A protein has these predicted regions:
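Entry/capping segment at the start of metal-dependent catalytic domains
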Residues: 1-3
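Extended, well-ordered alpha-helical scaffold/bundle regions in very large, multi-domain proteins
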Residues: 180-220
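Short glycine/serine/threonine-biased micro-segments
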Residues: 6-8, 197
Length: 220
């Protein structure tokens, strides 16, 4: 995520209602041509760039909402989204994460990817990334996915994430896991983002001592 570019933003505010805002999509370069074009910020002036809203303009409009403390933002592995948006000086707070919710409620029972959870809990088979971006040697990065296909894929992701949240969040109290999520797992999300962004310094000697201590405890 430290190198990923923001290609677009998908949003959903109610089940079945979602949108996708393309920001940096590009058309596939001519066959045999080596495309060393820009990052999609030219607002449609490049012949290989479809017309779309300027990224800075879009983020300026979205920033107040994404940083509004009175509006809960829900994502699946939202740490990834947070890391990318932070590079554009946009924060996301407060947040809920459906991947973390699933892990807290059903750790070890199954995978916690969006596709698997959508099928398992909602009975819905998501569009696969390979269906829109291709597979093998024909796979392209998301910026080269045609806008109509990108819309279907990205908007569905936002829709399914919100639907999963409606299923998972109420279970915290029912399964007596609210304290674990609210006091341990959710507060850890911004901490991990900060650690991955800034890095951490470790004293090798102290780390070795801790490793030895933990090994002894496990042996007991």
């Amino acid at each position: 995520s430290m190198r990923a570019e923001l290609v677009g933003v998908s949003l959903s505010y109610d089940a079945g209602k979602a949108c996708y805002i393309p920001l940096a999509h590009r058309m596939v370069a001519p066959q045999g041509a080596l495309d060393l074009g820009g990052d999609g910020d030219d607002g449609g002036t490049d012949q290989n760039t479809p017309e779309q809203i300027d990224r800075d303009t879009a983020l300026a409009l979205l920033k107040p909402l994404l940083e509004d403390p009175s509006v809960l933002k829900v994502g699946h592995n939202i740490k990834y989204d947070t890391e990318i948006l932070a590079r554009y000086d946009v924060g996301i707070t407060p947040v809920d994460d459906t991947m973390v919710l699933s892990y807290v409620l059903e750790a070890g029972q199954h995978g916690h990817g969006l596709d698997e959870l959508s099928l398992r809990m909602l009975g819905h088979a998501n569009i696969k990334f390979g269906d829109v971006a291709g597979v093998g040697k024909k796979r392209v990065t998301f910026e080269y996915v045609p806008l109509d296909r990108a819309l279907d894929y990205a908007a569905e992701d936002a829709d399914m994430t919100l639907r999963l949240h409606d299923v998972l969040k109420p279970r915290l109290a029912r399964d007596h896991m609210a304290t674990v999520y609210e006091t341990l797992e959710r507060p850890l999300i911004p901490v991990l983002v900060a650690m991955e962004s800034a890095g951490i310094k470790v004293a090798p000697g102290h780390l070795k001592t801790l490793s030895t201590d933990f090994t002894k405890r496990l042996d007991k």
